[in-house]
């Protein structure tokens, strides 16, 4: 199979690691080779969490600059920060609901303008799918399901060798039963949002 490289970036607490775990489980269920690595940074203090997932036969978990087939950003500024991993053929999916860093909140930093941020990403990549995933997570009944909204958008692109059914089966294994219904609804809302983007 053709190798596919995925980068997921988020701020600590947004559920990046659960999303990666669901994708890993889905790959395992359908016997797709997968190498995965994570960088936690200062995750517990709102720092960056980055996951690299490489689907296909490869020996490395490193995705070098310009190698990502797809970038999923749970937070807009983090998406912009990871843009160096992209190339002219990369598809970028980003949440447009910002989580303001401490420095911005105390007036010692400036958050990027969302319109300019999208223009920069659009210029460097093949396709940008950008929407407010936090709004869709609330609509699904769980404000913490932004990760599942973005997972739905990712699977809709058809870039990864995973189907909706495979990912939903993995969600049933990896997510808490109390949140399963809202997570499945969040996934479907993200899928629909990417479809109409």
Describe each model-derived feature in a short phrase.
Residues 1-197:
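Active-site cofactor/cluster-binding pocket
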């Amino acid at each position: 199979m053709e190798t596919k490289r995925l980068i997921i970036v988020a701020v600590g607490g947004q559920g990046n690691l659960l999303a990666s775990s669901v994708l890993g489980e889905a790959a395992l269920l359908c016997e797709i080779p997968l190498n995965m690595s994570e960088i936690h940074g200062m995750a517990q203090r709102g720092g960056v969490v980055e996951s690299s997932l490489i689907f296909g036969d490869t020996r490395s978990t490193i995705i070098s600059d310009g190698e990502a087939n797809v970038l999923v950003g749970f937070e807009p500024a983090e998406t912009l920060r990871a843009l160096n991993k992209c190339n002219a053929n990369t598809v970028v999916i980003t949440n447009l609901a910002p989580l303001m860093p401490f420095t911005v909140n105390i007036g010692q930093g400036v958050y990027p303008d969302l319109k300019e941020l999208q223009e920069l990403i659009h210029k460097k990549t093949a396709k940008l799918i950008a929407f407010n995933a936090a709004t869709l997570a609330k609509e699904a009944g769980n404000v913490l399901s932004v990760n599942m909204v973005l997972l739905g958008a990712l699977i809709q692109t058809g870039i990864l060798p995973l189907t909706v059914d495979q990912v939903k089966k993995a969600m049933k294994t990896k997510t808490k039963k109390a949140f399963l219904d809202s997570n499945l609804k969040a996934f479907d809302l993200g899928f629909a949002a990417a479809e109409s983007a």
